[in-house]
Amino acid sequence: MALLEICCYSMECALTAQRNGADRIELCAAPKEGGLTPSLGVLRSVREHITIPVHPIIRPRGGDFYYTDGEFAAMLEDIRLVRELGFPGLVTGVLTVDGDVDMSRMEKIMAAAGPLAVTFHRAFDMCANPFNALKNLADAGVSRVLTSGQKADAAQGLSIIMELIAQGDAPIIMAGAGVRANNLQNFLDAGVREVHSSAGVLLPSPMRYRNQGLSMSADIQADEYSRYRVEGAAVAEMKGIIVRHQAK
């Protein structure tokens, strides 16, 4: 049966995902940055209360995936911490300035991760050649690759995702970016073994007083009065589609 991974940005989201049938959680902070390394407090809380597998993301900042030596050193420390806390896997990715997988750094990541399952995230979609990148990641021992098929969303990139799947059984190709209940069946019919979804909604902040003339963000247009939340019904609907597909 296809596996359903839900992207969660808080303890509350993780509990919702677990209650509604998620098979695994990718744990992140900062949804507006596309996911950054969670805080130690969140990591410890989730590790204590969530029983399904949780893979924290290791990403020190938003933007591109070429990191300074200092940023990369911090990533390795975060990987060691995630390993010490007992998580079964993690999510990360590093590229060279030319858009190739940085194999030298991946070797260090794999050594720091040890027995943990490593997912190479959508840095893969920024690679110059996805098929060369996949071969390199297979050689590195990566467990899975999260990809939209190098398109804005996975529905548009499904043909490339299918080509990547055809390259072999490892790493597992996990489709993500815009995967929802209304298009999930297309991925299952295409033979995708794992899918990744935010299954989320933005809810208004409960703040009554709002200083409209001031922003805490460098982006003065940023909406600081909405909050991301996993929608339990969306997770349950997707899991139901997967179960019914398996029963055919």
Curated annotation (Swiss-Prot):
One of its GO terms (cellular component) is cytoplasm. InterPro entries: CutC-like (IPR005627), CutC-like_dom_sf (IPR036822). Homodimer. GO terms for molecular function: copper ion binding. Belongs to the CutC family. This is PF03932 family protein CutC. It comes from the Bacteria. Gene3D superfamilies: Copper homeostasis (CutC) domain. It is found in: Cytoplasm. PANTHER family: COPPER HOMEOSTASIS PROTEIN CUTC, COPPER HOMEOSTASIS PROTEIN CUTC HOMOLOG. Keywords: Cytoplasm.
